[in-house]
């Protein structure tokens, strides 16, 4: 449903940044109010990321007002906060389609708009990319400006500091804006800091500063005195020492919701040379009281009525796989005081809220630091404890070297609880868990499990926790199948699958939660179905039996076909000289766009109907 733009008269005048820059500066506060209301009304009808965007309205307006986008390059880290950017860059009328199949991408996306300089989704990439662009802009000599906007969560990642360290060394012209919405980090926001920011970014101060450096460069004691005096002035009111040490000129913190002050400061900073760092303070969920009070709950929202001041409650029903994992942690920790659970900033998403409250001494949130999370688990395993790393499939990619070098080579008992495996839906290409089976299957010592339902997931988590070596249990986003969950723990025999349905001629080997679809297709085909359970090691005895008793084998998995479980089946059969045709069903060799999980399964032929059709087509060849 498209919103009536006539209710937002100032916003109606700013469909693009070129139009925005024609507005008088005194109209910008009104524009921000209308943009914030428009964003709230739009996302409440479409679902999507809300609280982050509400907090960056003034910053977005100020950036596009001051900088000549898209010639000047603006990079949003992660991209949750970029909805106002999309609204102001010609995509206002398409906002109702965001995160939907065929609609606007959930994050800034290069293919979608010339204003989206960098395709994003994972955190902490913006400063590295911005530095690369700044180096090229400097070589081209076109006076192109480059700006990176990064949040206080994303900046904690090592990659961000690696980039800032390098930027301070090469000294290219670029601006990093820290969007800080954690008031505990810096509370001194107000008139003094706004005034100081203007002073520190103004022409008089910068000319004295740069001139003083040149004039006094041959007199080290005096130069040091000037520097220390400047740092003393700034240190009284700003927490910028770290960024200065990395080679940035630090300015702030300033009020990120005062659009006029932002414009003044950005205009000053636009002309500065070398790496600049602007620290702004914002409130996540700004302007909508329920989101201000619960920014985590309103980070990503379903459709809701803003007038009700609350989000719709889930209808209960089948538990999510994330909750299955969270319950397992609590039940297991009651038996095992040496269980240690680690998450890289995904407490809520991974179902660990209850565990973090009931077992705080056994819970470790390492922030956005996947590499550290994995090697922290290594140290805990060496120390005689039983670590579990709870991580999304797409984010484990960031800790791949540590998985090999720090866990698998030493054959340490670290279990990886891999959430969001397979297609996650609305977050699109950057978040689909399409590759974990492929990138783990080639690692020696790994035991890899793929449950078909929620009870199997619980028992596999127990199996992995008890296994004296590296293991992984991968499970999808969303709810289970309604299978009864056994409270008692039962360790599964490593590398053993199970026969679920006996048929003839065709055998379907299911890895993971496509088992229900496979069974439905098998009814129409009178096919045999096996729940393989283990991707590594494969149940070789069951494989031989199925190959001997059937004409065709079909493998199905919610992972890339290339290098996945089905590829492992073919490798084994070729090694054993078992010459039977094999059809691999799974995710194709492309990055898969957004849509609901159901829509994507149907499109890719991985629902029951699609599986049946694919098998019939293969048999007809």
From Swiss-Prot:
Pathway where it operates: Metabolic intermediate biosynthesis; 1-deoxy-D-xylulose 5-phosphate biosynthesis; 1-deoxy-D-xylulose 5-phosphate from D-glyceraldehyde 3-phosphate and pyruvate: step 1/1
E.C. numbers: 2.2.1.7
Transmembrane segments: none
Record gene name: dxs
Recorded GO MF terms: 1-deoxy-D-xylulose-5-phosphate synthase activity; magnesium ion binding; thiamine pyrophosphate binding
Residues that hold Mg(2+) according to the record: 152, 181
Keywords, sorted A to Z: Isoprene biosynthesis, Magnesium, Metal-binding, Thiamine biosynthesis, Thiamine pyrophosphate, Transferase
A GO CC term attached to the entry: cytosol
Gene3D superfamilies (UniProt xref): 3.40.50.920, 3.40.50.970
Binding note for cofactor: Binds 1 Mg(2+) ion per subunit. Binds 1 thiamine pyrophosphate per subunit.
Annotated family: Belongs to the transketolase family. DXPS subfamily.
Species assigned in the record: Vibrio vulnificus (strain CMCP6)
Enzyme class at the top of the EC tree: transferase
An individual GO BP term: terpenoid biosynthetic process
Annotated function: Catalyzes the acyloin condensation reaction between C atoms 2 and 3 of pyruvate and glyceraldehyde 3-phosphate to yield 1-deoxy-D-xylulose-5-phosphate (DXP).
Cited InterPro entries: Dxylulose-5-P_synthase (IPR005477), THDP-binding (IPR029061), Transketo_C/PFOR_II (IPR009014), Transketolase-like_Pyr-bd (IPR005475), Transketolase_BS (IPR020826), Transketolase_C (IPR033248), Transketolase_CS (IPR049557)
Subunit structure: Homodimer.
Essential cofactor(s): Mg(2+); thiamine diphosphate
Name the UniProt record assigns to this protein: 1-deoxy-D-xylulose-5-phosphate synthase
CDD domains (alphabetical): TPP_DXS, TPP_PYR_DXS_TK_like
Residue positions binding thiamine diphosphate: 80, 121-123, 153-154, 181, 288, 370
HAMAP family associated with the record: DXP_synth
Pfam families, alphabetized: DXP_synthase_N (PF13292), Transket_pyr (PF02779), Transketolase_C (PF02780)
Reaction catalysis annotation: D-glyceraldehyde 3-phosphate + pyruvate + H(+) = 1-deoxy-D-xylulose 5-phosphate + CO2
């Amino acid at each position: 449903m498209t919103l009536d733009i006539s209710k937002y008269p100032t916003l109606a005048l700013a469909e693009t940044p070129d139009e925005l820059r024609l507005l008088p500066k005194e109209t910008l506060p009104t524009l921000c109010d209308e943009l914030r209301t428009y964003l709230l009304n739009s996302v409440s009808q479409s679902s999507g990321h809300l609280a982050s965007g509400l907090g960056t309205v003034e910053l977005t307006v100020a950036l596009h007002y001051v900088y000549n986008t898209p010639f000047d390059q603006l990079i949003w880290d992660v991209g949750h906060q970029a909805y106002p950017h999309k609204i102001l860059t010609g995509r206002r009328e398409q906002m109702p389609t965001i995160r939907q199949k065929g609609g606007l991408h959930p994050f800034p996306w290069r293919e979608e708009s010339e204003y989206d300089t960098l395709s994003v989704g994972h955190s902490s990439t913006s400063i590295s990319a911005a530095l690369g662009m700044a180096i090229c802009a400097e070589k081209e000599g076109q006076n192109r400006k480059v700006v990176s906007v990064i949040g206080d969560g994303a900046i904690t990642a090592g990659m961000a500091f690696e980039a800032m360290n390098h930027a301070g060394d090469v000294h290219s012209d670029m601006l990093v804006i820290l969007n800080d919405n954690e008031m505990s980090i810096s509370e001194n926001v107000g008139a003094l800091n706004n005034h100081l920011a203007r002073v520190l970014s103004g022409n008089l101060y910068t000319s004295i500063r740069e001139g003083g450096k040149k004039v006094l460069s041959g007199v080290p004691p005096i130069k040091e005195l000037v520097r220390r005096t400047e740092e003393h002035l700034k240190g009284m009111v700003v927490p910028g020492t770290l960024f200065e040490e990395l080679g940035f000129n630090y300015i702030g913190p300033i009020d990120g919701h005062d659009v006029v002050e932002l414009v003044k400061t950005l205009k000053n900073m636009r002309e500065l040379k070398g790496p600049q760092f602007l620290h702004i303070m914002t409130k996540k969920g700004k302007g909508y009281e329920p989101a201000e009070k619960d920014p985590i709950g309103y980070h990503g929202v379903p459709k809701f009525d803003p007038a009700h001041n609350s989000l719709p409650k889930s209808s209960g029903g089948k538990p999510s796989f994330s909750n299955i994992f969270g319950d397992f942690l609590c039940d297991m920790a009651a038996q095992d005081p040496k269980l240690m659970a680690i998450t890289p900033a995904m407490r809520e998403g991974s179902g660990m809220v209850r565990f973090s409250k009931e077992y705080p001494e056994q819970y470790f949130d390492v922030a956005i630091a996947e590499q550290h999370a994995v090697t922290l688990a290594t140290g805990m395993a060496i120390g005689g404890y039983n670590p579990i790393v709870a991580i999304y499939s797409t984010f484990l990619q960031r800790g791949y070297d540590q998985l090999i070098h720090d866990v698998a080579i030493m054959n340490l008992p670290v279990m990886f609880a891999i959430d969001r495996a397979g297609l996650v839906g609305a977050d699109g290409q950057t978040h689909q868990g399409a590759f974990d089976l492929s990138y783990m299957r080639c690692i020696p010592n790994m035991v890899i499990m793929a449950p078909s339902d929620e009870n199997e997931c619980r028992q596999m988590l127990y199996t992995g926790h008890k296994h004296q070596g590296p293991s992984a249990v991968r499970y999808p986003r969303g709810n289970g199948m309604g299978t009864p969950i056994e409270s008692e723990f039962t360790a599964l025999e490593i590398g053993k699958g199970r026969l679920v349905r006996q048929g003839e001629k065709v055998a379907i080997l299911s890895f993971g939660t496509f088992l229900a679809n496979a069974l439905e297709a098998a009814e129409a085909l009178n096919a045999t179905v096996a729940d393989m359970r283990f991707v590594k090691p494969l149940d070789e005895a069951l494989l031989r039996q199925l190959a001997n008793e059937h004409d065709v084998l079909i493998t199905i998995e919610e992972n890339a076909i290339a290098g996945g479980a089905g590829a492992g089946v073919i490798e084994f059969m070729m090694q054993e000289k078992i010459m039977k045709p094999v059809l691999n069903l799974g995710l194709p060799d492309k990055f898969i766009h957004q849509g609901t999980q159901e829509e994507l399964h149907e499109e890719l032929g991985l629902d029951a109907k699609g599986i049946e059709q694919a098998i019939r087509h293969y048999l007809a060849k």
